[in-house]
Amino acid sequence: MTTLTISIIVVFVLGYALIATESLTKVNKAAIALLMLVGCWTLYMVDPMQYLQMMHPDYTGGAAGMVEKVTGIIQEHLGETATTLFFLMGAMTIVEIVDQNGGFNWVRKVMKTKSKRALLWRIAFLTFFLSAILDNLTTSIVMIMILRKLVTDHKDRMIYASLVIIAANSGGAFSPIGDVTTIMLWNKGLITAAGVIAEIFIPSVVSMVIPALILQAMLKGELVMHEVSALQNASVSDFTEGQRKAVFWLGVGGLIFVPIFKSITHLPPFVGILLVLGVLWTATEVFYRSLHRGQDAEGTQKRVTKLLSRVDMSTILFFLGILMAVSCLAEIGVLTALGQGLNVAFDGNHYLVTGIIGVLSSIVDNVPLVAGCMGMYPVAAVGDMAVDGIFWQLLAYCAGVGGSMLIVGSAAGVVVMGLEKITFGWYMKHISWIAFVGYLAGIVSYWLIRTFLYAV
């Protein structure tokens, strides 16, 4: 490993440490993430040829075409990152439109209970199954908006929000369309829909239920009901009950439609999100036009043009910085070398290798880790490396669920961190060990299933 490579890693680790201590430094994590992005790629440009020769052996342009090649590489990574950012912005805007126009009101009535623990279990299972249909990012945004309608105490809401992260990641792990890593494995033909659902469903449930059992001990008594519910109801009286339900189904139903749209058109998911946003935007404009409210300020504030200003841009920029910094680590070969080193260190023990990959996925982006594994290990005709083999199914589980161990370890965690202002330190102190226990319990349950139910 060269001095330059070590320097890039040091910049990443230092930036990560500053993000982890945001509550102490009082420096916004988005600012640090952007500095990580610039720092890593600036160091990369000190001597990019060594990395081009290592990671792109087909490159023959020499020094003359080096800058153009690196520019193309950065643009490729930026394009991949942008699809995530546009998806996130679209999903956040859709949920904001539904929320501000009263679309979640009837959902709140269905979920409403005075018991804190009863609400915890309703939130857990709704998040779990919703995440299997949607992606865990969109599910987290939806559930946080619902929680804000139900829970006024921020300390309690942080506990519920933490469970949303765990349940969203667990729910996405057993579904071929629930998480970007399972989509990658499914599209590559390494797992089948029937196989991953049959064998990963129970471990995923276990990885969610165990933390929920522990977290419910932190919640005692009854919820404080909203004293301003009448005022809140009045604030959404612009739309009729039918219009509010139409907004809900156009928004949430549209989000559910996104994976279907992707499978039909083969276009990236963000295109489907923009389709849903366009349809919902048009519908609300038609509804508001029919109200004839003139220059009513309150009604104007709920129109999409105003709601766009409510999108949390610091979260978007944080995503940009983190994903692009991690892409630099991928380009210098660190992630691939890490995967190969694990395989050698643990002598090919699939449970240990994938288990460690899961832990690592809570530190760095799981997408390049999974991509590295897909590139390192060839598919076998039979055995643990075959389609639906132990390795690939464990990889789907560990890469998905492992991200719950740190709040920045998954897209769900990052967006909840931004929406609910949960600090890295608080999550690590109170939630990380709980998520780790659930993670290990899920792996054990998978071992039991493979050993006793599917043993040949």
Where are these regions (language model features)?
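Transmembrane helical segments that form the transport core of multi-pass membrane transport proteins
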Residues: 60, 79, 101, 108-110, ...
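Transmembrane alpha-helix boundary signature
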Residues: 43-76, 92-109, 129-141, 328, ...
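Hydrophobic mid-bilayer segments of alpha-helices in multi-pass membrane transport proteins
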Residues: 6-15, 26-62, 81-93, 244-254, ...
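Juxtamembrane and boundary regions of transmembrane helices in multi-pass small-molecule transporters
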Residues: 4-7, 153-154, 158, 174-175, ...
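Transmembrane alpha-helical segments of multi-pass membrane transport proteins and ion-pumping complexes
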Residues: 41, 84, 88, 92, ...
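Membrane-interfacial helix-loop connectors
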Residues: 40-51, 78-79, 130-167, 171, ...
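Alpha-helical transmembrane segments
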Residues: 79-89, 195-213, 265-278, 392-402
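Interfacial loop-to-helix junctions that mark the boundaries of transmembrane helices
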Residues: 1-4, 24-27, 55-58, 67-84, ...
